[in-house]
């Protein structure tokens, strides 16, 4: 057994330590790249467990990498040296406090953007920046570590622009609070309480410490919503339109798809429609033999989308 794995196995519950070969292979890669193999995946459930893990790794000189929902495609949580320990934060996903009077919410770093949004929706509030397209799985800690953009970015900027405070376990295993939360008996309502230490731990991919909690501001949910889409033959006019709309603060989100991505999305939509049609036709046939014959006939005819349609730039 690896020396650091032996050490942490004596300090932490066995159920949060994973050395299964398949899990090691999975967690040693992100959506795009494969990194050096890690030696263990640890899924802490409390701040104390995170601190114990960090101290054990410090004693052994073992690198630590931190992972949220695993949606990174930029090597954000990949190890840079073999036999590192990966900390999977998704077990720490509690919504700690919602303060409607002072307009903030405190969450554990492993909470997904979708979970937070759905929890706040009945209260009529949301965070100004409220996650990525992958927010069903992507975590708040991961979004802050990679300084993600998407929902709300049209008016409120990036994830890092919308943080009041973070609670961080440092490289020595100490717990550090930033912003007004660093003061005893003070609420985490203000980021700029002295030097902006909060900013140190945003966009760092977890390199400067393990974020265990974050406090985000709250704003009212809009009373009405509207959506529109535009097609462009070239990227230049689309980008200029996006820039002008952003300058006028006319939308909370604006994003575009290039021809390649748009074509992939159209293929997926076409395949989904074909599958639905296949299911409907087959269900109408009587007898298993007829079902097989009709299904094979449709399958052999190929998908309705063959890439012949000209695809341009699309702005939503």
What positions do the PLM features span?
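N-terminal flexible segment immediately upstream of the FAD-binding catalytic core
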Residues: 1-55, 71-103, 262-269
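Short, flexible turn/loop "capping" segments at secondary-structure junctions
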Residues: 32-35, 97-98, 220-223, 307-310
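Short, hydrophobic beta-strand segments
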Residues: 34-40, 228, 310-316
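Short, glycine/charge-rich beta-strand/loop segments that flank catalytic centers
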Residues: 67-76, 131-140, 258-261
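FAD-binding subdomain of flavoenzyme oxidoreductases
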Residues: 94-98, 108-109, 113-250
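C-terminal substrate-recognition/cap domain of FAD-linked oxidoreductases
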Residues: 239-316
């Amino acid at each position: 057994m690896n020396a650091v794995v032996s050490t942490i196995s004596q300090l932490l519950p066995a159920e949060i330590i994973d050395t299964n070969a398949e899990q090691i292979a999975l967690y040693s890669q992100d959506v795009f790249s494969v990194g050096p193999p890690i030696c263990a995946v640890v899924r802490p459930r409390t701040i104390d467990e995170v601190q114990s893990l960090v101290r054990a790794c410090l004693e052994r000189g073992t690198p630590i990498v931190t992972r949220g929902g695993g949606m990174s495609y930029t090597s954000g949580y990949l190890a840079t040296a073999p036999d590192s320990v990966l900390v999977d934060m998704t077990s720490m996903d509690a919504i700690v406090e919602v303060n409607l009077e002072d307009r903030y919410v405190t969450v554990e770093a492993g909470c997904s953007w979708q979970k937070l949004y759905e929890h706040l929706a009945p209260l009529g509030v949301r965070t100004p920046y409220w996650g990525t397209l992958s927010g069903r799985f992507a975590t708040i800690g991961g979004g802050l570590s990679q300084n993600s953009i998407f929902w709300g970015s049209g008016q409120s900027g990036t994830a890092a622009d919308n943080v009041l405070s973070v609670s961080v376990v440092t490289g020595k295993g100490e717990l550090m609070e930033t912003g007004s939360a660093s003061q005893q008996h003070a609420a985490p309502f203000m980021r700029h309480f002295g030097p902006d230490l909060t900013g140190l731990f945003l966009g760092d991919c977890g390199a400067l410490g393990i974020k265990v909690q974050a406090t985000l501001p709250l704003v009212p949910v809009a009373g009405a919503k509207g959506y529109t889409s535009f097609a462009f033959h070239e990227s230049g006019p689309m980008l200029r339109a996006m820039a002008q709309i952003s300058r006028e603060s006319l939308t909370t989100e604006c994003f575009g798809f290039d021809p390649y991505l748009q074509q992939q999305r159209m293929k997926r939509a076409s395949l989904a429609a074909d599958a639905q049609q296949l299911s409907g036709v087959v269900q109408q046939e009587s007898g298993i033999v007829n079902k097989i014959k009709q299904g094979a006939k449709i399958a052999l005819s190929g998908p309705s989308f063959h890439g012949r349609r000209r695809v341009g730039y699309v702005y939503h």
